[in-house]
């Protein structure tokens, strides 16, 4: 057997071996600048950096850039890897440039949180809804420019049915953080929030009937 034929046979054997080892699936190699997001990307919200009434993080370590954008008085584009959360169960993550221009490269997440960590319930771009049935992308579109889709007072976004007392209570009771840090009024705020969620579920149920 000549050398070239031997090399071809060895290469074929190696290829078959890789196919068996990977279940026949091609090995996905991430892009060099890709922002990898999985359930471990999300942590106790109070371990993130507070900015006014929300929290931010950066999966690529670029916190200076994220903070600069968050505090820019006239708005700015957030750097890739930025995580923005108002409540523990919802998040926005800035993906790599060009990943989804329609959403400004933001990916939206609905999370399930517990003492054991975070579980991604839903993720995507223009098709993710929050627990009130509101579409995340549609809510944030009015703040496209110059705020890079970040909703705050005066950014043009439609008002949400919860106030800062409710979001603060949720932040302080994030089960991923261990012992809650309740403040006066948190119990009432959480009760009102649960009532709003139940009302929303009832409305959806009635709509489903008719």
Task: Annotate each predicted stretch with a short phrase.
Residues 1-2, 187:
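Helix-centric, low-specificity signal for extended rod-like, repetitive segments
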Residues 2-11:
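Bacterial N-terminal signal peptides that target proteins for export
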Residues 11-21:
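Bacterial N-terminal signal peptides
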Residues 13, 68, 123-126:
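A general structural-boundary detector
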Residues 22-26:
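Sec/Tat signal peptide C-region and signal peptidase I cleavage site
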Residues 27-53, 75-210:
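Sequence context surrounding c-type heme c attachment/ligation sites in exported
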Residues 50-64:
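Compact soluble domain cores
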Residues 60-74:
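N-terminal post-signal-peptidase region of extra-cytosolic proteins
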